[in-house]
């Protein structure tokens, strides 16, 4: 597997990590929701930028911590093996966030503590399967967890939830 390119980032070299700064979020196709087509549009216009990072992209690096300090809201899919450490960092810097994680995280003492204190909760879920686009060579052995639509391969990761501290209605 590997990182799937959403778009080309000027100045990037191969699989180099990049940052995205979004300062304006219009619904460009006017369908009532922000989707990948809207994001592609956003990133190709002056008020929104995607630029390569200087370092490795490790969330613990000085460069990434400086970016975190500037962020109003963090939306990401952190490394699942480092989820606890990543969430602790978001809490330390008092950031608003919407992040993906394995449902088993709610059983971890250091994460459940935030849930019990109402500082973190589970985000909205569509009650169905979440499909993630994967590279063509990504091996999926269970047929029910794989689908191909319009030539694009997707994988279902059944235990994935949204974790957030954003107010919802």
Give, region by region, the residue ranges found by the protein language model.
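Class I S-adenosyl-L-methionine-dependent methyltransferase catalytic core
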Residues: 1-75, 79-169
């Amino acid at each position: 597997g590997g990182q799937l390119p959403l778009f080309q980032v000027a100045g990037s070299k191969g699989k180099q990590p990049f940052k995205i700064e979004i300062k304006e979020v219009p619904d460009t196709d006017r369908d009532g929701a922000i989707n990948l087509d809207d994001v592609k549009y956003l990133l190709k216009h002056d008020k929104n930028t995607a630029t390569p990072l200087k370092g490795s992209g490790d969330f613990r690096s000085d460069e990434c911590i400086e970016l975190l300090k500037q962020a109003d809201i963090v939306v990401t899919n952190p490394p699942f093996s480092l989820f606890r450490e990543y969430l602790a960092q978001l809490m330390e810097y008092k950031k608003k966030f919407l992040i993906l994680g394995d449902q088993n995280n709610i059983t971890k003492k250091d994460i459940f503590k935030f849930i019990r204190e109402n500082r973190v909760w589970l985000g909205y879920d569509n009650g169905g399967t979440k499909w993630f686009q994967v590279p063509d060579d990504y091996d999926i052995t269970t047929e029910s967890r794989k689908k191909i639509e319009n030539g694009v391969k997707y994988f279902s990761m059944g235990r994935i939830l949204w974790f957030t501290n954003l107010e919802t209605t």
